[in-house]
């Protein structure tokens, strides 16, 4: 029977993680469990940065961005000897199970602890990229979306005033959910998504045709890592003879007060993760599909399940141009 659980946040931070931590802590305490917080993710676990938490430890954090437990990259966790030491540390505290909040890399760590050491872990999807399989939404995505849309709205104001083309680079790595959704909500004229081949020449020709028709300004939304957006801006300006500037939103998308959706989602997922552990269901990850909380085998979430590209959304955006 589980008596003590721990919780950590790993990888890139996301608004709403604190709500998930709070959900884990308070729901576990309500069931008579002891709860421990692991500071700075897997790095902190390896260095024994573990502290018992009370309900007051998570007071007044639901409205705060980031994660009060902190997070860190820890590539050394790939070493089996490092993982073995981490399990030894957990067991030295009498901890029976672990809740991991993060993205696919964090899930991989939880998967290895479960597979190699039969240590019960449950994953909660926390990343602004919305790129975790087995869930419609990840914690932090909606807040990051609002941040990106606000930035696009501001860029439109100044682009309109100066007859300028603006390129806005949006986070997401290999998943363009954030880019496509922000572009539709912000009324962007062009979308460059990571899931489809980037045809630079076709993009420039589209802009040229629009300018010939009298368009005064435009906004191009592009997913990060596809190209050097500043270089692209210079090329567009040289070709179409229209002032063009690039804006990289960067880590501003990860910060800020979490929206109500992410606070509620984090709370629900935190409680659900504890319920799974109480039912003896380690090795799973939490998700939300069609507004219902669900769980999947964490191995399937990593190896077999793939998020569907929003191709229909992208097609719709072209009809709205």
Curated annotation (Swiss-Prot):
Known EC number(s)?
Answer: 2.7.1.11
Checking SUPFAM superfamilies in the record gives: Phosphofructokinase (SSF53784)
Active-site residues, as the UniProt record annotates them: 129 (proton acceptor)
What is reported on the regulation of this protein's activity?
A: Allosterically activated by ADP and other diphosphonucleosides, and allosterically inhibited by phosphoenolpyruvate.
Binding residues for substrate, per the UniProt record? 127-129, 164, 171-173, 224, 245, 251-254
Q: Does the keyword ATP-binding apply?
A: yes
What this protein is called in its record is ATP-dependent 6-phosphofructokinase
Organism of derivation:
Histophilus somni (strain 2336)
At the highest ranks, the source species' classification is:
Bacteria, Pseudomonadati, Pseudomonadota, Gammaproteobacteria, Pasteurellales
Which gene carries the instructions for this protein?
Answer: pfkA
């Amino acid at each position: 029977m589980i008596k003590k659980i721990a919780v950590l946040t790993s990888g890139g931070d996301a608004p709403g993680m604190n709500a998930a931590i709070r959900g884990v802590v308070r729901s576990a305490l309500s069931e008579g469990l002891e709860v421990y917080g692991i500071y700075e993710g897997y790095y902190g676990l390896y260095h024994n940065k573990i502290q018992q938490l009370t309900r007051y430890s998570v007071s007044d954090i639901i409205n705060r961005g980031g994660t009060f437990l902190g997070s860190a990259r820890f590539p050394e966790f790939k070493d089996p000897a490092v993982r073995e030491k981490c399990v030894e540390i957990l067991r030295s505290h009498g901890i029976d199970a672990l809740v991991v909040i993060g993205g696919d890399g964090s899930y991989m760590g939880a998967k290895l602890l479960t597979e190699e050491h039969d240590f019960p872990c449950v994953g909660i999807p926390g990343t602004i990229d919305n790129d975790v399989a087995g869930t419609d939404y990840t914690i932090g995505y909606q807040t990051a979306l609002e941040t990106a849309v606000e930035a696009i709205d501001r860029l439109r104001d100044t682009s309109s005033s100066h007859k300028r083309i603006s390129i806005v680079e949006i986070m997401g790595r290999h998943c363009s959910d954030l880019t496509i959704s922000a572009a539709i909500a912000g009324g962007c004229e062009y979308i460059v998504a990571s899931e489809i081949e980037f045809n630079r020449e076709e993009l420039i020709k589209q802009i040229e045709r629009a300018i010939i028709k009298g368009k005064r300004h435009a906004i191009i939304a592009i997913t990060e890592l596809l190209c050097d957006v500043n270089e692209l801006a210079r090329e567009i300006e040289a070709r179409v003879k229209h002032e063009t500037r690039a804006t990289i939103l960067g880590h501003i998308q990860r910060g800020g007060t979490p929206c109500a959706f992410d606070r509620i989602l984090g709370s629900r997922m935190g409680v659900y993760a504890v319920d799974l552990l109480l039912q003896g269901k380690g090795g799973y990850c939490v998700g939300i599909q069609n507004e219902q909380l669900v769980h999947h085998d964490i191995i399937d979430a990593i190896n077999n399940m793939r998020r569907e590209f929003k191709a229909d959304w992208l097609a719709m955006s072209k009809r709205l141009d």
